[in-house]
């Protein structure tokens, strides 16, 4: 878009060149002829026929009245099941026997068997939703929520057993749902809760046998997909609402600045900012000395920055001084070397330069000239111009070549590359549409020997494809024009 705007702004300038006018004329002719060829080839008419044919046979939407229509809308609930902390949980049933639970970055596996792992004497006995001794804070609320969702009541039902999270065996919680003696109603209630949130699971517990639920952290299996229906069942089983509180973290920041607010590593001001709002607090050298003891660390840090700043400044000054001394030494050596070379050439009668007289080639028509070159001396007298005739002839050739190259570059610069691209692609467009015009496309289909049944699309039996008209059993043919 920027290139096109620049091209439009430069139209009055580049139209001053005859070549640019020719390129514009060729581009316009090719575009116009290409559009004419594209229209005459029948491609547009064929596309319009294929799009509109048969539209009168059916409606796009089901209309109930004049201004009422039957429509639908779909919602994507995948955003509710994100992989962040304190989000809605996901449940999975793998192979009808393996139960899984996931919320945020924590995932768990639920096993139901008859093997006793935890005992009341060696492990932790819990009878409240506070499971801090069993799981981490991010996992504690998820497990407590799941236990309540399957029907456990902390104030009425038996307590649970869990392994201390500091043990190396791993985190684990055990629930006894054996339907025997006085535990039968409790076991049936938790079983119904499991059947509700894990639809289609197989029951591994049998009457009269011990049955235990074990919950332990485990990676979420790859074959488990996010299903919001399981989450809805889980939420419907919950007995209370959970409001998760969120706090802002790392919202404010501080930086060292000068009194004007510009960032400076050695500044004595602290700038507190939040997005665009800021607050500036400055500490001078004398103010630092009278600050309370709680702010001595801030003062020491500012003094350290000031010391480092002065050290860097001193190092830069010393470096500049040494570089200048080295440059003067090198220049002196070069000057001595040139003087010695000229003296040797004078002794050997070799032409040399004394840097007092120079020659150059001047182009009188354009006023341009070449770079000055030294006029050589031999035996204390300047050389005759005929003695270095080849040199100034070559210099004149170089000058003319440079002038021609510069003029060519200026002419090229006055022809925008966008105009060249337009001319090239318009020519390609014209050639392509010319072939399409020579080939030709059929524009519609109708019954042979009869009129055009537009906008209906016919089948091989001469009837409308949508079924509005009965098959006439007549041959059809494609025509190019109406």
Swiss-Prot record:
Disulfide bonds join 92-224, 134-162, 205-211, 269-282, 353-374. Zn(2+) 2 binds at residues 444, 446, 452, 482. The chain crosses the membrane at residues 18-32, 34-53, 422-442. A lipid is attached at residue 2 (N-myristoyl glycine). Glycans are attached at residues 83, 95, 164, 176, 354, 362, 379, 384. Residues 2-17, 54-58, 59-421 are extracellular. It comes from the Viruses. The record marks 33 as: Important for GP-C-mediated membrane fusion. Zn(2+) 1 binds at residues 57, 456, 464, 466. Keywords: Disulfide bond, Fusion of virus membrane with host endosomal membrane, Fusion of virus membrane with host membrane, Glycoprotein, Host cell membrane, Host endoplasmic reticulum, Host Golgi apparatus, Host membrane, Host-virus interaction, Lipoprotein, Membrane, Metal-binding, Myristate, Transmembrane, Transmembrane helix, Viral attachment to host cell, Viral envelope protein, Viral penetration into host cytoplasm, Virion, Virus endocytosis by host, Virus entry into host cell, Zinc. Residues 33, 443-482 are cytoplasmic. The keyword ATP-binding does not apply. It holds the Pfam family Arena_glycoprot. The record marks 58-59, 249-250 as: Cleavage. GO terms for cellular component: host cell endoplasmic reticulum membrane; host cell Golgi membrane; host cell plasma membrane; membrane; viral envelope; virion membrane. Stable signal peptide (SSP): cleaved and functions as a signal peptide. In addition, it is also retained as the third component of the GP complex. The SSP is required for efficient glycoprotein expression, post-translational maturation cleavage of GP1 and GP2, glycoprotein transport to the cell surface plasma membrane, formation of infectious virus particles, and acid pH-dependent glycoprotein-mediated cell fusion. This is Pre-glycoprotein polyprotein GP complex. It comes from Tacaribe virus (strain V7). The gene is GPC.
């Amino acid at each position: 878009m920027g290139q096109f705007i620049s091209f439009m702004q430069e139209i009055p300038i580049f139209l001053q060149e005859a070549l640019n006018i020719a390129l514009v004329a060729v581009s316009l002719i090719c575009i116009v002829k290409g559009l004419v060829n594209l229209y005459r080839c029948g491609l547009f008419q064929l596309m319009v026929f294929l799009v509109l044919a048969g539209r009168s046979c059916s409606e796009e939407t089901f209309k109930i009245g004049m201004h009422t229509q039957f429509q639908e809308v779909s919602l994507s609930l995948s955003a509710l099941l994100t992989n962040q902390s304190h989000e809605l949980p996901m449940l999975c049933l793998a192979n009808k026997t393996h139960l899984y639970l996931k919320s945020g970055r924590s995932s768990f596996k639920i096993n139901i068997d008859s093997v006793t792992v935890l005992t009341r004497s060696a492990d932790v006995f819990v009878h409240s939703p506070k499971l801090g001794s069993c799981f981490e804070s991010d996992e504690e609320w998820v497990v407590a929520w799941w236990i309540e969702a399957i029907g456990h009541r902390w104030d009425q039902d038996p307590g649970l057993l869990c392994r201390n999270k500091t043990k190396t065996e791993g985190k684990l919680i055990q629930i006894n749902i054996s339907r025997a003696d006085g535990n039968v109603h409790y076991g049936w209630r938790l079983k119904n809760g499991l059947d509700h949130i894990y639809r289609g699971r197989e029951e591994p517990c049998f009457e009269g046998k011990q049955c235990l639920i074990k919950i332990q952290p485990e990676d979420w299996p790859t074959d488990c997909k996010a299903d919001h229906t399981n989450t809805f069942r889980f939420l419907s089983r919950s007995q209370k609402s959970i409001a998760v509180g969120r706090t802002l973290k790392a919202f404010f920041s501080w930086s060292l600045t000068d009194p004007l607010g510009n960032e400076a590593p050695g500044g004595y001001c602290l700038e507190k900012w939040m997005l665009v709002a800021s607050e500036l607090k400055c500490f001078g050298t004398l103010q630092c000395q009278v600050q309370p003891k709680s702010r001595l660390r801030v003062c020491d840090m500012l003094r350290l920055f000031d010391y480092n700043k002065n050290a860097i400044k001193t190092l830069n000054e010393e470096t500049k001084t040494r570089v200048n001394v080295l440059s003067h030494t090198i220049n002196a050596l070069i000057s001595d070397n040139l003087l010695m070379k000229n003296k040797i050439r004078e002794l050997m009668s070799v032409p040399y330069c004394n840097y007092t007289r120079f020659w150059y080639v001047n182009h009188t028509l354009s006023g341009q000239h070449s770079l000055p070159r030294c006029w050589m001396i031999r035996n204390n007298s300047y050389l005759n111009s005929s003695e270095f005739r080849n040199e100034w002839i070559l210099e004149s050739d170089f000058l003319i070549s440079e002038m021609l190259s510069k003029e060519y570059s200026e002419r090229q610069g006055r022809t925008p590359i966008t105009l060249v691209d337009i001319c090239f692609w318009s020519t390609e467009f014209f050639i392509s549409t010319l072939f399409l015009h020579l080939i030709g496309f059929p524009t519609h289909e109708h019954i042979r020997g009869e009129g055009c049944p537009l906008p209906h699309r016919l089948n091989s039996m001469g009837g409308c494809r949508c079924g509005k008209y009965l098959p006439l059993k007549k041959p059809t043919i494609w025509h190019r024009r109406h």
